[in-house]
């Protein structure tokens, strides 16, 4: 094949191209490796989980959960149940994360256990709809809350919201492209900010309770249903709530960038999930100390309405706090979304350019640019609550398949070293609830669930054409090589080199790009 650019193998890391040619700005003969750096400690690991979970969901989902629950009491039950199910899933992911210590999360585990097609379908749905939709929803929530004080009596103009959302997205794409350390510092800082914002809501809510303002929480009122509850509606309420908990598995996407992942991955999960469940439950309790169910359902910005009713002159604090919270959520989603694209390209399931990192910053710039572009497209179309239903259904489908893989791995490879091995009842209990949720979601919203399945299945022909079919015409190979060379020169990126042993912290040294000469013309 013409040219020297190496295509990633179907499994494992791509090998560096032989005899690379020096390019301007690099140091010929440098012996150091270009690789992803291990800069994520326990604190940053916790903030990645908390920062990704606590984004826009707690400010959007309460309305959807209450609408489908039919009562305050049942809505609160859904939030507690959501935290419990998330805890079960996170325990299973902790076992998978230390047994298969690869970045890529669900995608890496499904590919390892079920093979390339299953892994590609999960990757396809995640890259095409799950991540860009979640990022679009969080970005639009950010802009709506920032603009709320400017348009206090109406919904902010759609054009203004989209422009501000895009500006925020591009800013954070630049930050993540420039430095892993900058990205994690932003995550640490804004996670602390969002916890302070929710602590303010919870604190004001507790003050309301101590003053006796909890009429909606009294049992006689809390379980006064304004519609006949059904299992199908309860399943939809849980799907809405699950959007607020999405992100609990994101730390598994950056395992290779963690310091001592075998210890810090499970520790971060055990610290973060109970904390988030506590915060979510008491935030919703606080909402109901200030608003009736009807007021909450009619509110376009729940936290803003809460602030207007209880904070008076300081009500401006709430939209600012929510904006800071969602800003951190955008950063966290970008960070993990780009690592998923990076892992997929490294396995040969996405264009090889996405498996490359900048020679100095050691960041996956091509993957970040793809993430930004895909989110921008999704941002231009779609209703928020409909998008949440699509994403929640596909998310839960992928979670269940991954945890089913845990049981299959136990059976196939019983001798595999597992520093963490959860009780068998935990994955079984999760899968029982998972099956229940999906069945009743199909019954209640067949269109939404059907579209979700179709989105996943559209990846089948793409897999066979793009991945499985190896003997493509030479013109296709020349085109892809040419585009890869062009992308390398534009982004100044190189394949990361395999680590012979655990990499120490430190600056990423410059290295050589794989040959940037153009592919030779066929003879």
Swiss-Prot record:
Membrane-spanning segments: 40-60, 72-92, 113-133, 268-288, 310-330, 362-382, 388-408, 424-444, 448-468
Catalysis: reaction(s): L-alanine(in) + glycine(out) = L-alanine(out) + glycine(in); L-serine(out) + L-alanine(in) = L-serine(in) + L-alanine(out); L-threonine(out) + L-alanine(in) = L-threonine(in) + L-alanine(out); L-cysteine(out) + L-alanine(in) = L-cysteine(in) + L-alanine(out)
Topology of this chain in the membrane: Multi-pass membrane protein
Alphabetical list of InterPro entries matching this protein: AA/rel_permease1, AminoAcid_Transporter
Signal sequence segment: none
Keywords of this entry: Amino-acid transport, Cell membrane, Disulfide bond, Membrane, Transmembrane, Transmembrane helix, Transport
One cellular component term from this protein's GO annotations in UniProt: membrane
Tissue: Expressed in brain, heart, kidney, liver, lung, pancreas, placenta, and skeletal muscle.
Keyword Transmembrane: yes
Compartments where found: Cell membrane
GO MF assignments: L-amino acid transmembrane transporter activity; L-serine transmembrane transporter activity; neutral L-amino acid transmembrane transporter activity
Principal location: membrane
Keyword Membrane on entry: yes
GO biological process, one term: D-serine transmembrane transport
Function: Associates with SLC3A2/4F2hc to form a functional heterodimeric complex that translocates small neutral L- and D-amino acids across the plasma membrane. Preferentially mediates exchange transport, but can also operate via facilitated diffusion. Acts as a major transporter for glycine, L- and D-serine in the central nervous system. At the spinal cord and brainstem regulates glycine metabolism and glycinergic inhibitory neurotransmission by providing for glycine de novo synthesis from L-serine and glycine recycling from astrocytes to glycinergic motor neurons.
Family the entry assigns: Belongs to the amino acid-polyamine-organocation (APC) superfamily.
Quaternary structure note: Disulfide-linked heterodimer with the amino acid transport protein SLC3A2/4F2hc.
Name of protein: Asc-type amino acid transporter 1
Origin species: Homo sapiens
Higher taxonomy: Eukaryota, Metazoa, Chordata, Craniata, Vertebrata
């Amino acid at each position: 094949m013409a040219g020297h650019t190496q295509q990633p193998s179907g499994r494992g890391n791509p090998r560096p191209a032989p005899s690379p040619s020096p390019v301007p700005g690099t140091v010929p003969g440098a012996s150091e490796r270009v690789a992803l750096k291990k800069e994520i400690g326990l604190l940053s690991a916790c903030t990645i989980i908390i920062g990704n979970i606590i984004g826009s969901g707690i400010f959007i989902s309460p309305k959807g959960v209450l609408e489908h629950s039919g009562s305050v009491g049942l809505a609160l039950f859904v939030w507690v149940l959501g935290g419990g199910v998330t805890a079960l899933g996170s325990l299973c992911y902790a076992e998978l994360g230390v047994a298969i210590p690869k970045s890529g999360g669900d995608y890496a585990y499904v590919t390892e256990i079920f093979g390339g097609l299953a892994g590609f379908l999960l990757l396809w749905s995640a890259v095409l709809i799950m991540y860009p939709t979640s990022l679009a929803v969080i970005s639009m929530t950010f802009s709506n809350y920032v603009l709320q004080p400017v348009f206090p009596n109406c919904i902010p103009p759609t054009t203004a919201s989209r422009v501000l959302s895009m500006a925020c997205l591009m800013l954070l794409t630049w930050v993540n492209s420039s430095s892993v350390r900058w990205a994690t510092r932003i995550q640490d800082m804004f996670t602390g900010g969002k916890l302070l914002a929710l602590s303010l809501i919870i604190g004001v809510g507790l003050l309301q309770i101590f003053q006796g303002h909890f009429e909606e929480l009294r049992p006689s009122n809390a379980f006064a249903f304004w519609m006949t509850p059904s299992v199908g509606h309860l399943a939809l309420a849980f799907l809405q709530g699950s959007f607020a908990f999405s992100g609990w598995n994101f730390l598994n996407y950056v395992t290779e960038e963690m310091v001592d992942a075998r210890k810090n991955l499970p520790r971060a999960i055990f610290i973060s999930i109970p904390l988030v469940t506590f915060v979510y439950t008491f935030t919703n309790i606080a909402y109901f100390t200030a608003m009736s169910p009807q007021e909450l359902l009619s509110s376009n910005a729940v936290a803003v309405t809460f602030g207007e009713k209880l904070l008076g002159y300081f009500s401006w604090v709430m939209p600012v706090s929510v904006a800071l919270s969602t800003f951190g959520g955008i950063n966290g989603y970008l960070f993990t979304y780009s690592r998923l694209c990076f892992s997929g390209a490294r396995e040969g399931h996405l264009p090889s350019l996405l498996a490359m990192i900048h020679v100095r910053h050691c960041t996956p710039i091509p993957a970040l640019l793809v993430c930004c572009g895909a989110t921008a497209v999704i941002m231009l179309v779609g209703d928020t609550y409909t998008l949440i239903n699509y994403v929640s259904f596909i998310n839960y489908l992928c979670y269940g398949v991954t945890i089913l893989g845990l049981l299959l791995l136990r059976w196939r490879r019983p001798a595999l070293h597992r520093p963490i091995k959860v009780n068998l009842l935990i994955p079984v209990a999760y899968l029982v609830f998972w099956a229940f949720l999906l069945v009743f979601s199909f019954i209640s919203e067949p269109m939404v669930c059907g579209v979700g399945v179709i989105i996943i299945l559209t990846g089948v022909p793409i897999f066979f054409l793009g991945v499985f079919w190896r003997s493509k015409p030479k013109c296709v190979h020349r085109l892809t090589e040419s585009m890869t060379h062009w992308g390398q020169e534009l982004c100044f990126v190189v394949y990361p080199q395999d680590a012979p042993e655990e990499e120490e912290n430190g600056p990423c040294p410059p290295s050589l790009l794989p040959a940037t000469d153009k592919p030779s013309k066929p003879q």
